Amino acid sequence: MNPGALAGMRVLEFGSRIGVGACGRLLADLGATVFIVEPRHTRQQRDDDATSVSGGSSKWIDRSLATAAKHSVLFDSAREADIDELAALAACCDVVLLSTDVDGADVRVQQALKHCPIFCDITAFGATGPMAGKPASEFDVQALTGVMDTTGFPDGAAMPIGLPVIEMSSGIYAAAATAIAWRVLRRDGVGQRIDVALFDTAINALTTFLPAHFAGKASRRLGNGHSMAVPWNAYESKTGWILICSANDAQWRKLAALISPGLVGNPDYATLEDRLARRAEVDGHVARWVAGLEVDPLVDLLLGAGIPCGAIVTIDQLHAEPNLALRQSIAEVNEPGTGRAVRVPTSLVHVDDDAVVVPAIPPLDSGRAAAHALAPRPRREPSAVGSIRVPFDGLRVIEIGQFTTAPLAARHLASFGADVIKIEPAEGDSARAWAPHRNNTSHFFIISNGEKRSLALDLRSDGGRAAFANLVAGADVLVENMKPGSLRRLGFDRDRLRALNPRLVYCAISGFGLKSAYDGRPAFDTVVQAMCGIMDATRLSGVPVKSGISAADIGGGQVGLLAIVAALERRKVTGQGAMIDIAMQDVGAWLTQLRWNVSDVSARDTAYKGPVASVADASQHAQTVARELLVVRRDAVGTDWEMLASPMRLSRTPPGVGPPLGAASTALIGWRTR
């Protein structure tokens, strides 16, 4: 984001967890100055530490990725001079990033860091609850929270997702929480502690599975399938795997016509209900057809017929994948000292067509001079506790979103005080119909949206567009996950939005981005998982497997949240809004980065302790209960709903969980008074 949205923020990155490294990098990409504290170890000692800390959950497994875009400062707790320099640096910074569960509790280090106003601690279980402070790896957490139980095939065992998705997801939440805390620090002079737990992040990722549990049904694994659509699966062609999604009867008829004319009129498969009852038969027809074809022409054939699909891209192919290459999502740089070529991600946040910046990898201790040149931060007198406003008091947000990405970003903004108006089509959001229901409303819809107000608008009508334009003129944020180009076709391109409101922060989240090699291509979470390396990272006997949780959808929404918070801070300086372009494929590829520069991944890397918990087990776990991760709220008509608490815990300005979203209003509603 140019100028850097978080320019002026100084960050001291001390913790060794992968999530800490991810958080620091995201903040650096948004303009913060990040000093990463590196151990004064030999390379072999560093590698040994990376595999011994919490089962490989250490960022030092790849120094290039851990340090890119940051300033390196070497440190040894046994050296008094290093302790003194750490204290001096902390006094000059706004934020310190920690992972106290795996890095110990050296009293001298704690004393050295105490002058930093914002403490962000990323741990396995957080600071409260019966498991507080206990170390655990990514895969221990996947097993304990039900995430692992959702991944794998129906007739097989649960599988770990072959990537540290919960660590990386926690890093995104931590970065967003840090940006929110910095907003409060600059406004009110109040620092605070941020508590981000992998456990909480994982429970929050179960949005598609928790409703079934609360309806008294057991969640089950579906491999690469879909509980409500057939065919929807991964199939092996002559030259690679492909993911094909048929979401309705019309798409099935198009697919059947390609496979065999006789299949189109087969009454056994005529309706979705018929195909769900004969899942194996339908999959067999598709698999036999795909097996005789090559993947690239098959993708073209299916897309030409309007059938969502995607080749399953391997991780070693990602840098050359056409859309990732166009968006310059992966850069190749030389490692200092060795000269070895390594791959690193560029920024996930594309704003106002800014040029992509290739991050540099710092030589060891190359940031020490810059650290010495800093002056300590002057500390303001903090506001009285009673006068501290919620972070987004008075913020006005429009959301046009279905399913996960935009609703997730807007839900979290609402939890910190924003006034969110969700725009639904005149007939209502299609997710309202998703089973299971309570009082004729989808629990998935409720749990995904949280506390918002809803307005039904027909944006194809003159009256609907006029009402929307009026809302935009008074809004601070517009976040949407419509098919790229949809708003433009409705008469609201970038120029029109700027004319209506030059201060508007507009965030578009889509599968492949506004700038894309795949203009107009439909994208489901599963298709994006196929095309970003996630499915390649998790295989059973060579068969690629999607993560049970909607990793690409969730990540896209999280990055949208972070980008919006950062753009709001930039607006304070420039007075101007921003046009943000988030691609779920970029985010999904970013989640795989720890596999980019390694040639071998051993079974040890996904090892875990203890039994695999079900979604039901996880929802009732003592840690879930103690941290109140699932809370009950009553809607306007008296129905009680289980809802998710935020995984971002700020000590002075905590997020809230308000009453759930009700029915969409057909009468025009306006903004609340600031």
Descriptions of predicted regions:
Residues V286, V290, E294-H350, Y608-S651:
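C-terminal core of ALDH-fold dehydrogenases
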Residues A181-G223, L298, A311-Q317, A567-T606, ...:
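Substrate-binding/catalytic subdomain of NAD(P)-dependent oxidoreductase enzymes
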Residues V230-A305, C309, P322, V385, ...:
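Aromatic-enriched alpha-helical interface/lid elements that frame and gate functional surfaces
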Residues N2, V333-P391, G638-R674:
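Flexible, small-/acidic-enriched active-site or ligand-binding loops
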Residues M1-R187, H285, S366-M579, M584, ...:
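N-terminal helix-loop segment corresponding to the beta1-alpha1 unit
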Residues S64, V230-E236, I446, T639:
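Short, surface-exposed beta-strand/loop micro-motifs that present aromatic residues
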Residues T123-G126, L198-I203, T239-W241, A247-A250, ...:
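Glycine-rich beta-alpha junction loops
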